[in-house]
């Protein structure tokens, strides 16, 4: 049986409304629907980078003591944590060795998955 869930620790952590920091979490492997579903979301249609937020909210199954992880929670992650999670997502899903895009055409607002 192969591993489907992976533990991580955020560099900064999510600060909730009560002042609690949540750093330890679990991310599951992404499925095709995790990457396709956000494309139908109006927020992604107006801002393609928002797909990253939706995808992360779908694949993070646990973060600290939070009972639920929605895109609204992911929106409030520190930039360093989002960058860490994007790298972690690519690594566990075997996407880190994809064809590289020339440096002059890269855009930091691109979603996790190139369609």
Which role fits each region the language model picked out?
Residues 1-115:
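Short, surface-exposed, charged amphipathic helix/loop patches that serve as local interaction elements
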């Amino acid at each position: 049986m192969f591993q489907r869930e992976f533990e991580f620790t955020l560099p900064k952590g999510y600060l909730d409304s009560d002042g609690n920091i949540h750093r330890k979490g679990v991310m599951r492997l992404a499925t095709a629907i995790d990457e396709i579903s956000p494309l139908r979301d109006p927020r992604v249609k107006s801002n393609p980078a928002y797909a990253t937020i939706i995808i992360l909210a779908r694949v993070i199954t646990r973060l600290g003591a939070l009972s639920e992880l929605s895109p609204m929670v992911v929106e409030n992650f520190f930039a360093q944590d989002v960058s860490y999670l994007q790298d972690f997502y690519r690594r566990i899903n075997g996407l880190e060795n994809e064809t590289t895009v020339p440096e002059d055409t890269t855009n930091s607002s691109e979603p996790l998955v190139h369609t």
